[in-house]
């Protein structure tokens, strides 16, 4: 059988692409080296932020707004346990923070619902937070967090129900191109399609080592908290920048545990297989201490944690482009630790590509040619 589309990597973007492409009537094969959702990529750990006024640049705002619409649609399939939780997101940092300047600019350009607070205003609204006098907060009322593993599980189930073929726990070992399309090699045999999507996270380096993607081991951890830090008490998700420039992110507490991670830093690795578990690097459990001591002093000890992997591009912007020399193969990689919130819209973009539809978005900033 020759498929319309083969998806290599069925984590966040791949799961979404499988669903949207199958729903569009295409004959699709989803593949993954493991059984998604799983612990081997970048999507585990239960939750991911979704921010609209984007500190990484306003070029992302049209994408994230469409992503939000798609997340809302997906959440309707899990009304008892919604995939999107509108907790709000407070972005904290020095008044001269470049990241916060981008958040404010994005909000102004796209007329987003963002409230600016000074240090006293932040601490009055959320007494659990402590910030210096020179700090400001930009509160995104309509933002919040996503249940990442539930989202992937839902997409995969919906795709399967729609007739999508799924080949999991079966790594793709090679990709070949010829006049008839794309062929993948696996332990289960060879499969052919007219087009392919490669969205395998850091595993992309095993198939396409020439791509400018650097795997980086990252960790996040859960710390002892209480009901004051919960959504029920209106405690928000957050990003926070320390005076030295270190960037952190976190979520409201659930079951008396607050999850937090450090966005910058980490350990450079050469392949996804080199990632060691949480606590095998001495700094893992204490990485968030500088932020917790200064900003959330009421949070207690580290309870447990996990390691994940960023697939960093050189400029930490996404790579969304066809494979050089092969217009029938779309790459979605280099998501650099801020990609999950876009998984829905990136999956839709992939499905449009498979149908020969022109994207509704300007993808020029994400072209591989910027690295030449």
Curated annotation (Swiss-Prot):
Its EC number is 1.5.3.-. GO terms for molecular function: flavin adenine dinucleotide binding; N-methyl-L-amino-acid oxidase activity; sarcosine oxidase activity. The modification S-8alpha-FAD cysteine is found at residue 308. Its cofactor is FAD. It catalyses: N(alpha)-methyl-L-tryptophan + O2 + H2O = L-tryptophan + formaldehyde + H2O2. GO terms for cellular component: cytosol. Pfam families: DAO. It is an enzyme of class 1 (oxidoreductase). InterPro entries: FAD-dep_OxRdtase, FAD/NAD-bd_sf, Me_Trp_Oxase_MTOX, MTOX. HAMAP family: MTOX (MF_00515). This is N-methyl-L-tryptophan oxidase.
């Amino acid at each position: 059988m020759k498929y319309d589309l083969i998806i290599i990597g069925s984590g966040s973007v791949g799961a979404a692409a499988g669903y949207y492409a199958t729903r569009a009537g295409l004959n699709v094969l989803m593949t993954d080296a493991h059984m998604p959702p799983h612990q081997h990529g970048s999507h585990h750990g239960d939750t991911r932020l979704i921010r609209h006024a984007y500190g990484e640049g306003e070029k992302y705002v049209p994408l994230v707004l469409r992503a939000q619409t798609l997340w809302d649609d997906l959440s309707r399939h899990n009304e008892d346990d919604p995939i999107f939780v509108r907790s709000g997101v407070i972005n904290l940092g020095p008044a001269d923070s470049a990241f916060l300047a981008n958040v404010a600019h994005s909000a102004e350009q796209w007329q987003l619902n963002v409230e600016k607070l000074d240090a006293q205003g932040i601490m009055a609204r959320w007494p659990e937070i402590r910030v210096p006098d020179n700090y400001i907060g930009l509160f995104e009322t309509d933002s919040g967090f996503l249940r990442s593993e539930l989202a992937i599980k839902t997409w995969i189930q919906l795709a399967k129900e729609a007739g999508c073929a799924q080949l999991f726990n079966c790594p793709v070992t090679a990709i070949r191109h010829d006049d008839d399309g794309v062929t993948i090699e696996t332990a289960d045999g060879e499969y052919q399609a007219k087009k392919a999507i490669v969205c395998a996270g850091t595993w992309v380096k095993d198939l396409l080592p020439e791509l400018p993607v650097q795997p980086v081991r990252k960790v996040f951890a859960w710390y002892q908290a209480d009901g004051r830090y919960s959504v029920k008490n209106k405690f928000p998700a957050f990003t926070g920048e320390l005076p030295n420039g270190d960037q952190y992110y976190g979520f409201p507490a659930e079951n008396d545990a607050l999850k937090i991670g450090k966005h910058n830093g980490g350990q450079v690795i050469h392949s996804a297989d080199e990632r060691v578990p949480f606590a095998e690097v001495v700094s893992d459990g204490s990485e968030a201490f500088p932020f917790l001591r200064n900003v959330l002093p009421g949070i207690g000890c580290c309870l447990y944690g996990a390691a994940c992997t960023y697939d960093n591009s050189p400029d930490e912007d996404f790579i969304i482009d066809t494979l050089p020399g092969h217009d029938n193969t779309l790459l979605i990689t280099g998501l650099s630790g801020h990609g999950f919130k876009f998984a829905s819209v990136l999956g839709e973009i992939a499905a449009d590509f498979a149908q020969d539809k022109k994207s509704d978005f300007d993808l020029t900033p994400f072209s591989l040619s910027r690295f030449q």
